[in-house]
Every structure is written in C-alpha cells, then in structure tokens.
Amino acid sequence: MALTPTDVSRIALLARLELSEAEQSAMLSQLNGFFDIVERMRAVDTTGVAPLYTPLSAVQEVALRLREDAVTEVDQRQANQLSAPAVEAGLYLVPKVIE
C-alpha cells in the first residue's frame, strides 16, 4: 500500500497541518516507509508461534514483576467530604444534569 502526495495532502488537511512541499515530500517518504515495514511484517508466517509479552520470554523464564496490590494510604473520606456541598452515605451528591 503506497500513499500518493494527494493522500498526504488529505491527511494533513484532516489533521489541520500546514505542510510545505518539502515537509509533504518527507512525510510521504516516512509514511510509505512505515507501510512498507507493515507489509513485510504481514508477510511473515506466524502460524504456531506463541505471542510474547516481552522479547525476553523467548530466551528465558520471565516472571511478571508486579507489586502486591495493597492499600498504602489511610482512608480520608470524611475529611475530604467536609468541603462538599452535599454528601449522603459517604457519596457525593451532584445535581442532575441529564433529564
């Protein structure tokens, strides 16, 4: 899939970009280079290849480095709600905006 200068002009118009002729030519070259890479990746047969969440998992066992989900802050709900105009059962009350 190769883009034309007309395509780049339309993309620039939609993005509200003002491109000079030199910028438009450079953008055309960059976008076509990107689409060339995408086409080459599409051509690779990946049937039977398991997806990787990190490239390291292809060469070694990788454990997810996630922290334990633990509460680290104290509950300050009541203090935070002191300045609210209306609170009920620990919830902020707001005016109805959609009828």
From Swiss-Prot:
EC number, as in UniProt: 6.3.5.-
A Gene Ontology molecular function term of the record: glutaminyl-tRNA synthase (glutamine-hydrolyzing) activity
Gene Ontology annotations of biological process type: glutaminyl-tRNAGln biosynthesis via transamidation; regulation of translational fidelity; translation
Cross-referenced SUPFAM superfamilies: Glu-tRNAGln amidotransferase C subunit
Record's keyword terms, sorted: ATP-binding, Ligase, Nucleotide-binding, Protein biosynthesis
Keyword Protease: no
Catalytic activity: L-glutamyl-tRNA(Gln) + L-glutamine + ATP + H2O = L-glutaminyl-tRNA(Gln) + L-glutamate + ADP + phosphate + H(+); L-aspartyl-tRNA(Asn) + L-glutamine + ATP + H2O = L-asparaginyl-tRNA(Asn) + L-glutamate + ADP + phosphate + 2 H(+)
Transmembrane segment boundaries: none
Matching Pfam families: GatC
NCBIfam families in the record: gatC
Oligomeric form and interacting partners: Heterotrimer of A, B and C subunits.
HAMAP family: GatC
Purpose: Allows the formation of correctly charged Asn-tRNA(Asn) or Gln-tRNA(Gln) through the transamidation of misacylated Asp-tRNA(Asn) or Glu-tRNA(Gln) in organisms which lack either or both of asparaginyl-tRNA or glutaminyl-tRNA synthetases. The reaction takes place in the presence of glutamine and ATP through an activated phospho-Asp-tRNA(Asn) or phospho-Glu-tRNA(Gln).
Protein name: Aspartyl/glutamyl-tRNA(Asn/Gln) amidotransferase subunit C
Organism listed in the record: Methylibium petroleiphilum (strain ATCC BAA-1232 / LMG 22953 / PM1)
